[in-house]
């Protein structure tokens, strides 16, 4: 209360000595009183990927595209301590790094600043998200029949889209081979690239560089029917190749995997491969859905609902026949969704998926239909749960919804038009965690309608 009075007295004093209201509002005195969460809340961080050699004016353009707001007259600052020049790049201004980087920025509207909070090497999750963004912007590769039928009115469709006359099995297979969420940087090629001094930008490659890359790719992607003499070109010619020319040189490219690799190489300047887990998901396998009673551990105890529908993380302890190991592997903390970034911290979309797959939270959030739509039936409660997860007691739905808006320009979550508190997962949940929205909703419903079985499961887990 005293601090509030002091602020009011200071405001009156400055106005009385002739200070303009706008100057007073923009003063340091007024800024220091602003709620820190409003200006620098981690959920307000905008993640941008670009080459560190690009000028900061390029970063401004990318941020403007992400948030849909003009940032004229905004200045660049590094961690609120050093002002940066927009016509220079970060390397010229004492930030070490090379190639593609992840830049975390905050928009400070009062100060009219674009504050660079962090400059990081992209994580696997970040590269995967970037791959999704890049590939999502590409026109889908066309077959000869598609090209002839759509030459008059070309239509951009998702990468996983198939012909209407294709069978249902082929459509499902098309979804399984969708690679955009599971591309990672190939560290082995990167080391060789540094050793052989191959430029990072593919358009700077020589004939020898292209040949070396292609020989690696033939083994990595198991390319068949490829004639090395057809690929005698330099990097500029490689990057300028159309999909029609690509098809002539490589007629067989299941799932457009190698074409996608080439586009990521051209657009992002990194040599990427499909993550091993995604590679396994591309191969035919037994149906994943089993009855609730049939899913059990080595010790005979059924997994709880939440444990059944979450996949083990890569860091999970391998299960063994011992009771101690089995109990440890059943701990819910060992189960997570793919794509955890920011040093293992849970992201908002992961949190929403987590409570959507917990039958205990069906009174605050629920699935709607079978296409990934969900509704916050108690948005304030959901916000409080998110605040508890992030250790932010002041979290409310307004801040939660603002954080959700950063997903709208990607392929993760979107707002359902015309419906209050309704959102939709646009990503391929089947590829991401192994279950689609319909399967998740069914599993949650099973847990809700059979509380005795869920309670018994928990008892078995504790006893074990």
From Swiss-Prot:
GO terms for molecular function: DNA-binding transcription factor activity, RNA polymerase II-specific; sequence-specific DNA binding. Keywords: DNA-binding, Nucleus, Phosphoprotein. Its main location: nucleus. GO terms for cellular component: nucleus. Uniform distribution throughout embryonic development, with slightly higher expression in pole cells. Residues 138-173, 281-300 are annotated as: Disordered. One of its GO terms (biological process) is regulation of L-glutamine biosynthetic process. Residues 291-300 have a biased composition (Polar residues). Residues 138-157 have a biased composition (Low complexity). Residues 346-426 bind DNA. It is found in: Nucleus. The modification Phosphoserine is found at residues 153, 167, 171. Belongs to the ETS family. May have a role in germline development. This is DNA-binding protein Ets97D.
């Amino acid at each position: 209360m005293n601090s509030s009075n002091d602020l009011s007295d200071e405001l009156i004093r400055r106005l009385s000595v002739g200070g303009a209201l706008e100057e007073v509002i923009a003063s340091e005195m007024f800024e220091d009183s602003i709620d820190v969460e409003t200006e620098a809340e981690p959920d307000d961080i905008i993640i941008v990927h670009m080459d560190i050699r690009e000028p900061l004016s390029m970063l401004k353009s990318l941020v403007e595209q992400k948030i849909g707001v003009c940032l004229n007259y905004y200045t660049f600052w590094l961690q609120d301590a050093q002002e940066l020049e927009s016509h220079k790049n970060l390397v010229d201004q004492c930030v070490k790094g090379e190639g593609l980087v992840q830049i975390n920025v905050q928009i400070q509207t009062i100060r009219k600043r674009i504050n660079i909070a962090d400059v990081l090497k992209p994580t696997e999750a970040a590269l995967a998200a970037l791959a999704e963004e890049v590939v999502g912007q590409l026109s889908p590769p066309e077959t000869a029949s598609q090209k002839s039928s759509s030459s008059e009115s070309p239509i951009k469709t998702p990468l996983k889209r198939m012909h209407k006359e294709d069978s249902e099995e082929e459509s499902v297979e098309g979804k399984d081979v969708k690679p955009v969420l599971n591309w990672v940087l190939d560290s082995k090629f990167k080391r060789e690239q540094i050793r052989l001094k191959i430029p990072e930008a593919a358009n700077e490659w020589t004939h020898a560089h292209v040949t070396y890359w292609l020989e690696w790719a033939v083994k990595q992607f198991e390319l068949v029917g490829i004639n090395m003499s057809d690929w005698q070109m330099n990097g500029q010619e490689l990057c300028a190749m159309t999909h029609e020319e690509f098809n002539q040189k490589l007629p067989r490219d299941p799932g457009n995997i190698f074409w996608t690799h080439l586009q990521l190489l051209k657009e992002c300047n990194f040599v990427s491969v499909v993550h091993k887990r995604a590679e396994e998901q591309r191969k035919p396998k037994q149906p994943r859905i089993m009855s609730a009673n049939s899913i059990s551990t080595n010790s005979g105890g059924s997994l709880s609902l939440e444990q059944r529908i979450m996949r083990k993380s890569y860091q999970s302890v391998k299960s063994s026949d011992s009771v101690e190991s089995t109990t440890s592997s059943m701990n819910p903390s060992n189960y997570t969704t793919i794509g955890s970034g920011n040093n293992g911290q849970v992201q908002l979309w992961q949190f929403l998926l987590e409570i959507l797959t917990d039958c205990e939270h069906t009174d605050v959030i629920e699935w709607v239909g079978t296409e990934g739509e969900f509704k916050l039936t108690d948005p304030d409660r959901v916000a409080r749960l998110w605040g508890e997860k992030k250790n932010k007691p002041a979290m409310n739905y307004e801040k939660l919804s603002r954080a959700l808006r950063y997903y709208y320009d990607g392929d993760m979550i979107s707002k359902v038009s015309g419906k209050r508190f309704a959102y939709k997962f646009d990503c391929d949940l089947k590829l991401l965690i192994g279950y689609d929205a319909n399967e998740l909703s069914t599993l949650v419903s099973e847990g809700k309608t059979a509380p005795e079985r869920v309670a018994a499961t928990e008892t078995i887990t504790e006893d074990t």
